Amino acid sequence: MMKKRTLGCICGGLLLGAFLYWQNNGLILTKMTYRGEIPAGFDGYKILQIADLQNKVFGRRQEPLLRKIEQSCPDIIVISGDLVDRHENRTDVDGAMEFIHALVTYAPVYFVSGNHEHQSGEWEILEEALVEAGVTVLNNGKSVIERNGDTITLLGLADK
């Protein structure tokens, strides 16, 4: 009886560990179709949103993540905060920018900062690097996108 209980606990622990690993390292692409009113020129328009990476690394040079992004063929990419981790010893602006330099080759990139950017102490450096890479930073701003004679407006509200 004790051996079965011990074996059950070990198996349960292994399953829990595998689940937690997958939760933190799995890449999931969720597709959503907006059913509200949009201009006809934007029919079929794909917006890929990335949030809360917090300097997480998915494979060598983010290759698994970049493959998923490339396969989705987005018209634009929107990063809605927390690209970097706010903790002093884990904020990696260079690593984040390596990812950004790859992203801008797929589609125009728009960025709104999150609390991690502002609390990292590296926001000014990151913002300058993003702009230099061709990213549109929308902190408390907007950008009008035109397609097939129609327009939509992206709004960004910074999280401080």
Task: Place the predicted regions along the sequence by residue.
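Short strand-coil-strand connectors
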Residues: G41, E146-N148
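Short amphipathic, positively biased membrane-proximal segments
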Residues: M1-L14
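Conserved hydrophobic/aromatic beta-strand scaffold that supports enzyme active sites
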Residues: L29-T33, K142, L154
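N-terminal active-site segment of His-dependent metallophosphoesterases
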Residues: G13-F99
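Core catalytic region of metal-dependent phosphoesterases/phosphodiesterases
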Residues: R61-E146
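Active-site-proximal loop/helix segment associated with metal-binding centers of metalloenzymes
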Residues: G156-K160
